[in-house]
């Protein structure tokens, strides 16, 4: 989709998140719409690097590897042009920590809520079922460690963490100011 690739003239925000992380859900709820507006206005670009370290840290019986499966599902949704919608649905339906996501949720229910249907649904489900994005998800997760990010959520620009928690407002201009401040190294 537009304005998702880094461009030299605007800040490129990199978000590290784990779909089972409750604080990631809070950040998505609080700052997600502002970030999307800034992307649509061409004021920032944004990359999401999905982690799945919580898969090893919390019991998820019987829904093992929930964060990894959600990361692969989100990548499959992107392949059919529905990343934004699917990403939003994942967080809107985040289970209580330790419960995890079922395959039914990830491949059927969330796809429907994100508006994936017809041939796109068949493509999405095939990509999910064959784990087509397993390597992509693994590489995305590995970038977190390579960047020295110790936990999620982390919003980073030019290698500097954006200090969102100190903001007085979550309106797009306030968020943009925080991004620009971090980008220039003055936060």
Q: For each predicted feature, which ranges?
A:
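Short pre-active-site segment immediately N-terminal to redox-active cysteine/selenocysteine motifs
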Residues: 17-20, 151
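C-terminal cap of thioredoxin/glutaredoxin-like
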Residues: 112-187
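Structural recognition of the beta-strand scaffold that forms the well-ordered cores
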Residues: 14-15, 45-49, 154-156
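Structural alpha/beta surface segment adjacent to cysteine/selenocysteine redox centers
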Residues: 25-104
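Extracellular/periplasmic catalytic domains that process cell-envelope and extracellular macromolecules
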Residues: 7-8, 39-41, 146-150
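A short beta-strand-turn-helix
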Residues: 1-13
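Extracytoplasmic/secreted proteins, especially bacterial periplasmic and envelope-associated proteins
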Residues: 26, 30, 34, 68-72, ...
């Amino acid at each position: 989709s537009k304005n998702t690739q880094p461009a030299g003239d605007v800040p490129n925000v990199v978000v590290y998140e784990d779909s089972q992380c409750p604080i990631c859900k809070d950040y998505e709820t609080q700052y997600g719409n502002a970030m999307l507006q800034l992307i649509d206005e061409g004021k920032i670009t944004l990359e999401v690097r999905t982690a799945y370290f919580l898969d090893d840290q919390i019991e998820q019986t019987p829904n093992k590897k929930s964060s990894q499966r959600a990361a692969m599902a989100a990548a499959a949704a992107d392949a059919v042009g529905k990343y934004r919608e699917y990403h939003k649905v994942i967080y809107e339906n985040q289970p209580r920590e330790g419960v995890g996501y079922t395959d039914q949720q990830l491949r059927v229910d969330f796809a429907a809520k994100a508006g994936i249907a017809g041939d796109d649904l068949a493509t999405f489900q095939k990509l999910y079922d064959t784990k087509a994005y397993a390597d992509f998800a693994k590489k995305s997760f590995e970038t977190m460690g390579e960047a020295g990010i110790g936990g999620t959520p982390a919003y980073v620009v030019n290698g500097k963490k954006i200090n969102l928690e100190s903001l007085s407002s979550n309106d797009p201009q306030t968020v943009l100011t925080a991004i620009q401040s971090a980008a220039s190294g003055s936060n």
